């Protein structure tokens, strides 16, 4: 029997050409780039800021990685942001300077951006794209992970309940940090936020409870540090600080400096968090992630948005910045069945000291509180210049109290807040009416204000106070007032702790002053 031959002209609807085209589109979805050779393109049609537009592209996929080869042989990588018909818009991580529209070749890899991860990354220094810059060998990868992370089932998240003791009194007593929390440092240009972050890295540890079964050993602790758009001095400060304290073996550094490409800053925090997730959930380490400076990251986001000619939001930042920041900050926490945790401390510098700026404003919505670094305290030579009034820790309530720190912790914190706030009001009133018009109670609050800033907030960069020493110091300051004025503390707590005999560690706090 003779085979039937399609006599219809090729190219017409229903002909073999359209069937072939349909088959080709179906295969494009499941295309195997190992058995099929990749297509190399020389179809760069325009370059706009950090973006390259390619034409006559087949099988392009969203978020696919593209490798560029420049005329001089230099290799660069980019990511597909948008596909429309045969055109693809690619964001180049290393910048677009030197890309020749005529001679640059590019190749689509068919894969998303993955980073090699290994426990051997601790003690190493990488650039903003994850390549080693410490003259060491390439990382022998245990796995290649998607830099956008794996979504965590909210039902499997564990509520953070173990307090981290930082050794810094205003943080430990009034803004306690729980393991697995995300809490940013709101700072501004010229303030010592780097020194505070370094001090937290040096001194951080759990408040050791009795009969604990958790692993408190130093080997179980790791730090992942990601710098975006920082100067060489800041990078050197952190690196030398880690080396001097002997913790460099437990630190993994990702450095995107001010003279590195701006667009690279978009992937730097994601590389750092992917590494942190591997160390926390596969190696079961307790990881502290420090991201500085999130303002540089947001400006890189604005640059890409402007190049794509998207409708700008407040101050020119893209409307999706809230969502984008959330994809970074939400990668903190604890997961049921895993021994590790990720605690995030992002640092951001507020432009013009403005807390209503979109970057700190949106960050405050997503994160679980903030630590506010104040310029007026810094100008008065107080270190760390942490203003406790705008500072907040939303998870503090579950990390303190009897069995975790001490039963008077919450009440002492509330009373210190109340007295300091009233003291600030009295100070403002004194500037208007003069000291003679103040009552004796007002003068007590004024005295407390000065003592609080000089003795409680102020401490040395290498001075570590335990949470119990800080609480006893708080009681020492509260004894400025008669018992009747301490309205935020229950009577049974006052009876137990107010008298000097009731606080056995108070003599140690005296000598510390």
Swiss-Prot record:
Q: Could you cite one Gene Ontology molecular function of this protein? A: proton-transporting ATPase activity, rotational mechanism
Q: Where does this chain mainly localize?
A: membrane
Which InterPro entries did the record assign? ATP-synt_VA_C, ATPase_a/bsu_AS, ATPase_F1/V1/A1_a/bsu_N, ATPase_F1/V1/A1_a/bsu_nucl-bd, ATPase_V1-cplx_bsu, P-loop_NTPase, V-ATPase_su_B/beta
Record-given protein name: V-type proton ATPase subunit B, kidney isoform
* Subunit structure comment from the entry: V-ATPase is a heteromultimeric enzyme made up of two complexes: the ATP-hydrolytic V1 complex and the proton translocation V0 complex. The V1 complex consists of three catalytic AB heterodimers that form a heterohexamer, three peripheral stalks each consisting of EG heterodimers, one central rotor including subunits D and F, and the regulatory subunits C and H. The proton translocation complex V0 consists of the proton transport subunit a, a ring of proteolipid subunits c9c'', rotary subunit d, subunits e and f, and the accessory subunits ATP6AP1/Ac45 and ATP6AP2/PRR.
The UniProt annotation places ATP binding at 394
Q: Which gene encodes it?
A: ATP6V1B1
What's in the GO CC field? apical plasma membrane; basolateral plasma membrane; cytoplasm; lateral plasma membrane; microvillus; proton-transporting V-type ATPase, V1 domain; vacuolar proton-transporting V-type ATPase complex
Entries under PANTHER family matching the protein: V-TYPE PROTON ATPASE SUBUNIT B (PTHR43389), V-TYPE PROTON ATPASE SUBUNIT B, KIDNEY ISOFORM (PTHR43389:SF1)
The scientific name of the source species is: Bos taurus (Bovine)
Q: Which domain of life is it from?
A: Eukaryota
Where does it localize? Apical cell membrane; Basolateral cell membrane
